[in-house]
């Protein structure tokens, strides 16, 4: 029997509207929860809100309402957002919930009694927005008066700090630093991705852990300390304990805590709060003699070209706008595909619309449309029985799919969503290539091979069924739509993932509806920019007078005759590999209609880390470029055309129906 699986988001601080950064974390956890359920695990998925603190009290006062009313309103909005994003959480915890507050108070008194908490006095620079104290050396900027005395400053987050001096209770972190280091050595994979643990050790543990202030007396919106009610429990005991209280820790009904805390426990957080979860939380668990979580995943941020999202910059992206305009699945796909593990990702409207058009509409949508149409045309809508090796290309397709499915599961277990989706899109690309290889329109002719045609249709339908299964945790609506068009029930598990498992005598829909209609790139990019508040970047409609257009080009103007001397052809990628000794070059074997394949070297390796996704693509190449020697031993017999956009590069392709060697121009 598989172990129960517990996955948590951080609890969000409801001081403002949530943007796609918070949506990313919540969707990422949702994808993992759905995947684990499909793999047969019993899953508990927790999210919620951190509703106490000075900032909430201040904002409520400014709004003329009580703090409770303020957080009630925010909780309603956040729940509505998670419903819009189809988040399959099991519990939505609020730190104002009675059961949570009762456990927080009891734990505080327990730690006080065992001398892991003590009363002292704290003086330091405090950021209300960050709810954190900073030393002078930690401040990003220091303000001084005319005598050189420090009078204020800016926290690393960019928020202003103020000097605070007050009586406070402290958590004895320093008592546990050796145990924490020992734990890190025993569990080197506890913090992911690799490298984050060393960052915590070098920056915070090696300099010496300082005891942590865990109560405040300057505001009242929090859990009162029972034995000293002028103090309220400070955020990092209150907030972190939610992961245990939501399961029933120290409550009458603790069955879920017994089950899931002793199962597999994953926390996912943004890298900005890693310190609190990698240092404070494990030490708190040591004090309470509770088992450690299995994994702490700290992801990067989505940033804009001009830095972090900011309303003043007009670059904040809210998920509601993207869902209402483009649907839910494109947002879930984009966020999970575009943030590299361990790094930040850059959101651009161009990339968002481009991924919908090229990866969802072209690659996946066209494959489904063509498959359903051909099964209707050639077999009256009934999928032929699956047979192995009905054509010379079946074995290669099957082997690639098996290998990519293994990669998919490996990357899903590692919570490496971009690579998991790369594996899926490699299957999609190979299946599209399979259509071109087998040429079903030729097999369907009177003198064609109907048995081979049947095998092709069965393999296409079976491949799409597998794709619908593995994308289900990411894109539930799309998965269900593919299964419906194939005449199948929605995905309910991932246990039957073999081509041969396609049900016999299945009837596809009479006419498939495009699951991702192509978008007008310019119009939709302008729409996103307008919603972000970037009016300066929007195309303005005006009367078009061609003679008045100021033409722009990066190079000198050439004559038509000069351009006409360039021969651009369609070339299909047969093979592609990295070039040994070069980080930039890829080595292509292409069919450009010469009768024999050519070799082309192209410096695009960094833009295509999974170079195999290019196999089967029909590219545009300069065919009459004089061959040249590269890397001393390779001859390059042409140039692959590509387009640069920002810091990205995309090769230029043509429709798969265009024959190899066709002249462009």
Curated annotation (Swiss-Prot):
The UniProt entry annotates the motif 'KMSKS' region at 308-312
Enzyme Commission code: 6.1.1.10
Q: Does the keyword Ligase apply?
A: yes
Q: Where is this motif: 'HIGH' region?
A: 12-22
Entry GO MF terms:
ATP binding; methionine-tRNA ligase activity; tRNA binding
GO biological process terms on file: methionyl-tRNA aminoacylation
In this chain the tRNA-binding domain maps to 562-665
Transmembrane segment boundaries: none
Subunit info here reads: Homodimer.
> What's the stated role of this polypeptide?
Is required not only for elongation of protein synthesis but also for the initiation of all mRNA translation through initiator tRNA(fMet) aminoacylation.
Q: Which NCBIfam families does the entry mention?
A: metG (TIGR00398), metG_C_term (TIGR00399), PRK12267.1 (NF008900)
Q: What is this protein called?
A: Methionine--tRNA ligase
Which organism does this sequence originate in?
Streptococcus pyogenes serotype M1
The gene for this chain is metG
